Amino acid sequence: VAPLVSAINDLLSRLDRSMSTQKQFLADAAHQLKTPLAGLRMQAELAQREIDAGQQDPKQLKSSLQHIAHSSQRAAHMVNQLLSMARAEDKESGRRQLQEVNLARLARETVRDFVPKAMENRIDLGYEGPDEGQGLHGRLMGQPLLLRELVRNLTDNALQYTPAGGTVTVRLMDDPFGQVVVLQVEDTGPGIPEAERDLVFRPFYRALGTNVDGSGLGLAIVREIVQQHEAEITISDARPRSSLNAGQGIGPGALFTVRFPLEPDPAPEGPSPEALPP
């Protein structure tokens, strides 16, 4: 009886922790959504007062409309990230949707999608890896939608933290001996201190000393997708901290590395027994 009671107590304890975690997540999500929605309401009320008072200053109205557009974009981005988080956590659905994925194509398309944002922020965004028509030594089995989301979130995170004039590189490397494909996203931003490298994968966590406008869910989504694909992710400095000149104001940068296991290519079928000579 004692082992049964102990097992039940352990199960109840884990359920309680899970419910507490979910409640905290919902509270954090509500708080994050409240900020852009409050901005929407404030700017809409300001514009309405301007119109009611007959003081239709075009510059003031334009400023209010710009703030409304920005706040609505933030709210929409948060909702999209929450939906992505839900998809990434749906492990049962994921197992039913595995198919061969061309990760190089996803990486190239992601870089192309982010070029306008990189140019707007004066960041050099580039891709290094297999070109169209070049394959891997093995097959990556996964969910294309989630893997695209992973590459997008890592790239977006790098662009968010890289200052103007910096560089972001999306890199794909094939390891034929280890039967893995390695995806790296490298930037020239401030980097992530070693003590915070596990913390940044928590929902809504922001590195100390940063003031980046984002949902705070991107890396949490990345971790869920990595775990679903039985991959591993690590964070390191892009450049040794000892080699940096403090007076230049250049950070070590962050290097995110994801290793995906590959399945071997199917062996070519041999001739049928009927085709063999006697």
Language model: regions and residue ranges:
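Short helix-loop "hinge" at the ATP-lid/N-box region of the Bergerat-fold HATPase_c
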Residues: A158-L159
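Membrane-proximal HAMP signal-relay module
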Residues: V1-L26, L33, A38-Q56, R87, ...
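Short alpha-helical segment of the dimerization/phosphotransfer core of two-component systems
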Residues: H67-A75
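A conserved beta-strand-to-alpha-helix junction within the catalytic ATP-binding
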Residues: A2, Q97-R112
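Short conserved segment of the HATPase_c
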Residues: I192-F204
